[in-house]
Regions:
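Conserved SAM/SAH cofactor-binding pocket of Class I
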Residues: 59-135, 143-144, 150-151
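Catalytic beta-strand/loop module used to bind and position nucleotide/cofactor moieties
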Residues: 84, 142-148, 260-262, 267-270, ...
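Short loop/edge segments at beta-strand edges and connector loops
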Residues: 124-126, 246, 324-326
Length: 467
């Protein structure tokens, strides 16, 4: 039910109204004690058809602890009984809460008054998919426990509960919210969504990344067959524009001159003297994506250079749907499609990250390479840059006040990406000997065995993989 329920006689047919009356009258309102922290809880009166606080509600509240900003303006979509809205209002946030279920709006208003925060909580009927509904322009934080049930639940839920709990049939509510965020240029807003992508691929967070939004996981919990994850999304640098050049010798050299504050990156339409690892020539053609990022060296206090490089590779590979060859090659169907380069300068306190991606497949010096038209389609270099910018920002952008992902998580993600190639039957050799790759260290080096000898491989010069 995508339209509002302000006039039930207009919004629901006779059978739906009868079902709603039967469903609502079969139960009474219930009182829930919802624990908002170790010391305090709030009492919530929850009418029939209104979503009560459950494990996912607690997980969402836990995830919001990873947003380290002063209270401002918060919007909650799908407020249900008002649990999240009231908890954040008690922290000092000014909350605008929306729900398509009018009983949820009434419940949120009543529960806010009981909690003593009705002066900071405004509850209104409406939400994503409603005609003429828009996100409040002053929102600092938008929160939504996304509907996760299959839309094929007719006659199981009441119509109003169905509207609140079931996903949109065609594209999914996540993508509809993304459209609103892009249309209304919410560049300075952080979106925090509780998503279930295991059984609902329409809620994939990669949809946001591929539209230029960085993401960071705040909390995760396995519930039955599903993984529920609280994810924060934001525009890299809160929408700040990269430096753009029509032509340059090297974006890595140009990156030395970028300001030493904020989210800084530079891209060029053409690069004449690009370089790869240890000064190797990086060949690029018109239309390729060539860019460099300049990040404060203090980020290395969190991630070692080796782990940072493979983590960036893993994040980019996840966004593009390609594979990673340790330590810095991006691979599509056994052919290189791009590469990553890291350089640091202790004198100016920065680390520079260079990324080059081929747009079209080709051949050079007898070696064939792939291009993104084969795995993403016909997008231009600026659109590709936005994806890469979002992927790198997910790790390194400190513009938003969001907790960084733990090193061990990136170590696990990177190892999982490396395994995609290793599991295809490739032959790995180190120092001329065939080896079995068994893990990735916290420093980003490979752990390997040959017979009874253990190796930790940190230099690619003595290492090779044959497809």
């Amino acid at each position: 039910m995508n339209k509002g329920l302000r006039n039930l006689g207009e919004k629901m047919g006779t059978s739906e109204i009868s079902r709603e009356v039967e469903y609502s009258s079969s139960e009474h309102s219930k009182v829930h004690d919802f624990k908002i922290n170790d010391m305090n809880s709030i009492k919530l009166i929850v009418p029939p058809t209104v979503y009560p606080p459950r494990r996912d509600t607690k997980l969402l509240l836990k995830g919001l602890e990873g947003i380290n900003m002063q209270p401002g303006n918060l919007v909650e979509i799908g407020c249900g009984s008002g649990a999240i809205s009231i908890a954040k209002a008690l922290e000092g946030w000014n909350v605008t809460a929306f729900d398509v279920n009018p009983l949820a709006v009434v419940a949120t208003k009543g529960n806010s008054e009981v909690a003593g925060v009705n002066d900071r909580v405004t509850a209104e009927e409406g939400g994503v998919g409603e005609e003429n509904w828009k996100l409040p322009a002053n929102a600092d934080l938008v929160v939504w426990n996304l509907p996760y049930l299959s839309p094929d639940l007719e006659n199981i839920l009441g119509p109003m509960e169905e509207a609140a709990l079931t996903d949109e049939r065609l594209r999914g509510w996540s993508e509809q919210l993304l459209d609103l965020a892009n249309e209304e240029s919410q560049n300075g807003t952080i979106f925090v969504l509780l998503m279930n992508s295991d059984s609902n691929p329409k809620n994939s967070p990669l949809t946001w990344v591929r539209k230029g939004w960085s993401k960071r996981s705040l909390a995760v919990e396995r519930v039955g067959d599903d993984t529920l994850e609280v994810i924060a999304f934001w525009r890299p640098g809160f929408g700040s524009e990269p430096t753009y050049l029509e032509k340059t010798n090297s974006t890595m050299d140009e990156a030395r001159n970028l300001p030493k504050f904020g989210w800084q990156r530079i891209r060029s339409a053409e690069q004449i003297s690009g370089r790869g690892r240890k000064g190797a020539i990086w060949h690029s053609n018109q239309g390729d994506m060539i860019a460099s990022w300049s990040v404060k060296l203090e980020e290395l206090n969190r991630l070692t250079p080796g782990l940072l490089q493979v983590s960036i590779g893993a994040s980019i590979c996840e966004a593009l749907g390609v594979q990673m060859k340790w330590p810095n090659d991006l691979i599509w169907q056994g052919r290189k499609c791009g590469g990553i380069l890291l350089e640091s300068s202790t004198y100016d306190g920065t680390i520079r990250i260079g990324v080059g991606l081929n747009k079209k497949a080709g051949e050079i010096e007898g070696f064939s390479y792939s291009g993104w038209t084969e795995y993403i389609g016909e997008i231009d270099s600026n659109e590709m840059f936005q994806i890469i910018d979002a992927a790198i920002g997910s790790i390194l952008d400190s513009t938003p006040p969001i907790d960084s992902t733990e090193n061990t998580i990136w170590q696990q993600k990177s190892w999982a990406k490396l395994c995609e190639i290793l599991s295809t039957g490739v032959v790995a050799k180190f120092d001329g000997r065939a080896v079995n790759i068994v893990g990735l260290s916290g420093a980003g080096s490979l752990r390997a065995y040959s017979d009874s000898t253990a190796y930790e491989i940190s230099d690619v010069d003595d290492f090779s993989i044959t497809f």
